[in-house]
Structure formats: structure tokens, C-alpha cells
């Protein structure tokens, strides 16, 4: 059952609202050297085209920190500076970026955290308390180990530090590399704080591994009403992180956008190369943002039943096929004419739906 979202304190990263009633935002992270402004800008442009709302960049040295001023001028997305170990880089970064991410496990003493908070206060930018199971502070790691309890205790401790410094513009993440610890940690912390949550599974692996882990962990939490912004971490192509994240949002009921694809797993009845055709159709219609249920079936046996619930369906037969709109057959065509006609019909339906929404 899809539960109502937990209402959290709202913060802003650039012009993007996080928490409260704001849509759940997606973000990713560049892998270029941040000081290489041209390469980093190119990667950010790719994220923007893929539909990202925010982007995070690594600040590994002073050169990276100083480059943020110029990068901010050309970035099409709000910038988050990712800081580990060296708090002074955060002080430089805060002068240019839209948010700072710190890892409480390695940022240093209370005095160093205070310095970062003061810099963020001055520029009116938020902080992410980014807790990682693999790098907890010594006191929590020794007492609890890399467990959900240890992660939650670290988050609560650092949230209290920021609150004591009269700073409440922050969000929290609790990341582990597996599904169970991730879900348990967020569930445990949710009733204890009002702050927005950044969801993610850290070091989740390649496209296949990460998609499974992220769909289970993030999708489950989203359906429970938990989560305000998210990143799907993938070892692979940049755009895939945003593509998978937005798919998780759609299928967890948190984003009403784009096509919900329905296609059969194939069997001995199919009369066409359904695998290639389904891939071809999905690629050709990937630009559509209108919420539609589209069915691609290898035979009429399944198609007629599935099409009753689909906005548009295509069913392949013996060198011919059907196009079905809202449960009614509108075309019976030779196979060579099916694909282009189907694409046109889906595009026209999307336009009809968009027009009706505006009217």
C-alpha cells in the first residue's frame, strides 16, 4: 500500500525545494576532476538532459575548491560540494556552491564542524549530514559497528550539534551498501527527526546490481512515505543513475511522468522478434513525458487482455499485427507498417492527453 509522504522541514538547494510538499528530487555526482571545469560542465550538462534536479561534485583538494566559483557560473544545476576529511575545503566551497555535504565520520572535531556551519550560515546554504555505515565515527563504530543503530546514533549526534549551533537547514542520509541495513536505518530515524532525508544505497555496483538494490531499498522506503531527494549510485554511464532513479519514483507512485511499459516475457506463440521490437519502441518513444500505459505484445492472446487496461497496445501476429487504443482495435496492418503507425498513434495520444490536462 502506498502511504502518505512524511512531511518534513523544507530546505532549498539553489531554487530546488527539498522536503515539505516538494516533489522528490533526483541527483547524481560527477566523476571528473572538479578543477577540470570543461569536463565537469559537460558531465553536468548530461545530467541535466537526463532529468536531474541537482548535482554533487567532489572537492578533493584546494584546487577543486577554488574552481567551484567558475563552475557555479556555468552549471545548469544547483551545485553540492562533497567534502571529506578537510573542513577548510568546505569553507572555500561555501562561498560558491548551493549546499555542502559533510561526512561526520571524517570531517573532524566540533570546532571544525562549527566553522563549516558558520560559513554555511553566512551564505544561507544547507548542509547534508551524510552518514555512511563504512565510515562511522570511532565512538559509534566501536559501540555498534556498521549497523543501522550506529548510523542512526551518528545522525542524531550530528543533528544535535547543528541544532546547538542554531542551524537547522540540513538534510540527512544514512547509506549502507546493502538493502536491509539501508531500509532499517531510515525507518529507525524517521520518527525521531523532522529533517528531510536524502535516500541512497552507497557503492551499489554496476547497472544490474544497483538497479536491483536501489529499487528494493529506495522503492520500499518511498512507498512508506520516506524520502525527499535521492541518488541511485551506479558504476557505469552517468545518465543511467537518473534514468533508474526516475523509474523508481514512477513505479513507487511518487512521479506521474512518462510511459509505463508492459511487454510479455515471450513464449512459443510469438510471431515476431519481440525483444528487438520492444527495445526499438521504447527507445523511439523515450521522449514522451505524458503518463501512459503502453503494451507491446508478441501475440494477440495476451494483447487483447492486457490492452483493456493499457492506453495503447501493439500485438504482433504472423507477418501482421494489431494496434489497440484504450481497449479497441484501431488498426490491423502488415508487419512492415506496424512500427511507424504505432509510434504516430502513441505520440498523438500523448498530445491529446496533454491538451486535455491544459483545458
Curated annotation (Swiss-Prot):
Binding positions ([4Fe-4S] cluster): 264, 267, 299, 306
InterPro entries: Dihydropteroate_synth-like_sf, Enolase-like_C_sf, IspG_bac, IspG_bac-typ, NO2/SO3_Rdtase_4Fe4S_sf
Enzyme Commission number(s) of this protein: 1.17.7.3
Keyword Acyltransferase set for record: no
Reaction(s) catalysed (UniProt annotation): (2E)-4-hydroxy-3-methylbut-2-enyl diphosphate + oxidized [flavodoxin] + H2O + 2 H(+) = 2-C-methyl-D-erythritol 2,4-cyclic diphosphate + reduced [flavodoxin]
Enzyme class: oxidoreductase
Protein name listed in UniProt: 4-hydroxy-3-methylbut-2-en-1-yl diphosphate synthase (flavodoxin)
Gene for this chain: ispG
